[in-house]
């Protein structure tokens, strides 16, 4: 059976669930080696090239493909073949091959409609070894236009594809523009235009936002951003809503260990009192988790129980802190269960 649930879905899903759940303390980049410092600089420089965004994410794609994904899927040939098929599908549609990307950053903006619905708009900047001439897909319709001296190719994809074949941000119309010899912008047309402006120094993302995503020099994935009031103001869960609405920012990292993976997310609230209240609420929900898990199929109960048991919750200043460490076999079991 084809699964839309994948390792990145797991990672990002736990982080998003942490908007009522996950974290760890500040920067863990102490004792950074020259190599990790170089990684931090590379991530920060590419993130700084994003257009204005409410939240950002940085991914070490080379490590993701060569190490993290094979480990997360326990080197399952069928699952790894499925991932490669998704990568090839996006390549066939746009000409962009994830295997040529070294690092990817994503900028997210929120747009509220007149009806109060919040729309999420994304743009990705990929840095790697590729050529503009390679963007010549055979299975999609393409239009070309000029903007601020750059060429934008807009592809109409016949079927929905994952962004670069890895991320569950499914797109049908994909705009692609080379920003320089080694950097390409991918996303909705309006956001790609904004990325072109940002590459020229206009309307860039706030340094405060990018700093949240680069707290850990060794992270496989780092992310951070603001939590707009529009995302939480309509929650109707009593005191729980009040606690969640106190969150102003978040940051999170996903890393690898000798035996598996670790994750952190910090939920930054408006004051220390709010952080303590939210921490207490999450701890209470964690204690109730076994009752909810008992209603699930047995195949899902065990990996989810391991996830809950291995998470730790606390408060430090204005931050709610939650850590999670999972062995490789537990990550593989969680993915397999979904």
What are these regions (language model features)?
Residues 1-10:
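Bacterial N-terminal signal peptides that target proteins for export
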Residues 142-146, 175-177, 254, 309-315:
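Short, exposed beta-strand/loop patches in secreted or surface proteins that constitute
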Residues 168-233:
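A conserved glycine-rich beta-strand in the N-terminal activation segment of trypsin-fold
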Residues 57, 122-126, 248-254, 259-267, ...:
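One face of beta-strands
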Residues 24-166, 170, 213-243, 278-310, ...:
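Structural boundary/hinge residues at secondary-structure and domain interfaces
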Residues 9-19:
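Bacterial N-terminal signal peptides
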Residues 52, 119-121, 149-150, 177-184, ...:
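Short, solvent-exposed coil/turn segments at beta-strand boundaries
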Residues 229, 239, 251-273, 277-289:
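Small-residue helix/turn framework positions
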């Amino acid at each position: 059976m084809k699964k839309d649930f994948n390792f990145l879905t797991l990672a990002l899903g736990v982080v998003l669930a942490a908007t009522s759940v996950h974290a760890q303390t500040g920067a863990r980049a102490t004792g950074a080696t020259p190599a990790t410092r170089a990684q931090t600089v590379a991530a920060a420089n590419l993130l700084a090239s994003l257009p204005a965004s409410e939240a950002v994410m940085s991914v070490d794609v080379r490590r993701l493909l060569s190490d993290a994904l094979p480990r997360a899927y326990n080197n399952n040939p069928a699952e790894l073949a499925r991932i490669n098929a998704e990568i090839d599908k996006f390549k066939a549609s746009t000409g962009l091959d994830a295997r040529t990307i070294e690092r990817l950053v994503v900028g997210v903006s929120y747009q509220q409609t007149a009806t109060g619905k919040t729309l999420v708009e994304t743009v990705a900047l990929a840095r790697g070894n590729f050529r503009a001439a390679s963007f010549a897909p055979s299975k999609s319709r393409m239009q070309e236009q000029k903007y601020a001296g750059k060429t934008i190719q807009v592809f109409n994809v016949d079927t929905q594809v994952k962004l670069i074949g890895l991320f569950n941000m499914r797109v049908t119309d994909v705009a692609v523009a080379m920003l320089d010899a080694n950097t390409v912008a991918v996303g909705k047309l309006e956001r790609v235009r904004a990325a072109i402006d940002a590459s020229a120094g206009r309307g860039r993302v706030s340094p405060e936002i990018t700093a949240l995503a680069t707290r850990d020099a060794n992270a496989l994935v780092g992310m951070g951003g603001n939590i707009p009031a529009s995302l939480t103001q309509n929650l109707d869960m009593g005191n729980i809503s009040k606690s969640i609405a106190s969150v102003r920012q978040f940051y999170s990292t996903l890393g690898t260990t000798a035996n598996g993976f670790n994750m952190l997310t910090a939920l930054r609230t408006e004051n220390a009192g709010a952080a303590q209240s939210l921490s207490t609420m999450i701890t209470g929900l964690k204690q109730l988790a076994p009752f909810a898990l008992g209603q699930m199929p047995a195949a899902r109960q065990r990996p989810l129980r391991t996830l809950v048991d291995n998470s730790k919750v606390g408060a430090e200043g204005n931050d709610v802190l939650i850590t999670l460490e999972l062995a490789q076999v537990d990550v593989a079991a969680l993915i397999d269960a979904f």
